[in-house]
Regions:
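Residue-level recognition of the GNAT/N-acetyltransferase active site
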Residues: 73, 77, 101-103
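Glycine-rich phosphate-binding loop
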Residues: 80
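Acetyl-CoA-dependent GNAT
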Residues: 3, 7-13, 17-69, 73-75, ...
Length: 144
């Protein structure tokens, strides 16, 4: 089972909402998915023509390149599909630095970011009480 990555289309909205683990708990996530598809750069990963993950790029983090979301179906985690989704976002990033955040509890994402040469550079408290958000950065090129 080989994963392929492509730009998302509006028609992918239902598939993204189905695989997103937050949608059942928080209906605002479905609206976020619609907004990302309309206004941001979204890539999807497919296995056997079925969407199994997605990644969102924008400039929502202090106008810097930002990976706003990486979501993979639980059955497809740990198979390097996250890496396949993040690589094109790095290529598209038009700022010298690319940022991403993840919860302290999300060890799998932390390992992925480290493997892709992101470096922890801070944290944000109180977004998810008791589970701070770690901020990561990857320097893509010299500033100036």
């Amino acid at each position: 089972m080989t994963a392929t990555v492509r730009r998302a289309r509006t028609a992918d909205a239902a598939a993204l909402k189905t695989l997103d683990t937050v949608v059942p708990e928080d209906p605002r996530r479905a609206a976020s998915i619609d907004a990302w598809l309309a206004h941001d750069i979204v890539f999807v990963a497919e296995v056997e023509d079925k969407v199994v993950g997605y990644a969102v790029f924008n400039h929502a983090f202090f106008r810097q390149g930002n990976i706003d979301m990486l979501m993979l179906h639980p059955d497809h985690r740990g198979k390097r599909i996250g890496e396949l989704l993040l690589r094109p976002l790095e290529s598209l990033c038009d700022t010298p630095k690319l940022f991403c955040t993840t919860n302290v509890s999300n060890h799998r994402m932390q390992r992925l970011l480290s493997r892709l040469e992101f470096v922890a550079c801070g944290f944000i408290d109180e977004l998810d009480p008791g589970d701070p958000e770690l901020v990561y950065v990857k320097k893509l090129r010299a500033e100036g």
